[in-house]
């Protein structure tokens, strides 16, 4: 699940993480029921700090027939694109996954504050704990979520993990 840098734009992308996020979104919609999502107009936001990841996530959603009835309810943007907006459910793809523990502009905590405060009911964060734990903020966030029993380990060799926090349950 390692990240890659786009040559032409210098943006970062983690395709496996994006694919995992899309799968988690589909499972989440199935769990609360497609009918309920449509009837109650439950809206979803997908946030990533990197444009390359945003473009890839958009292409995955667009190509997946499952999401066709929900496309108007799903917004995918960078952190800056979500400023001032909220959604019922937010999924965040942090992208960074490398052995050096480099997190780039994820270290800008103002941006992270924007990302993690956009959810009205549920927040799901997908990221590589071993990379992110090099930074004190992410280490504390991970520990907090772990104490709440909301960390889901995916069990692959890079220890990529999905962390989930609930504001309210849907």
Regions found by a protein language model. Give the residues of each.
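Helicase C-terminal subdomain and adjacent C-terminal extension
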Residues: 61, 101-170
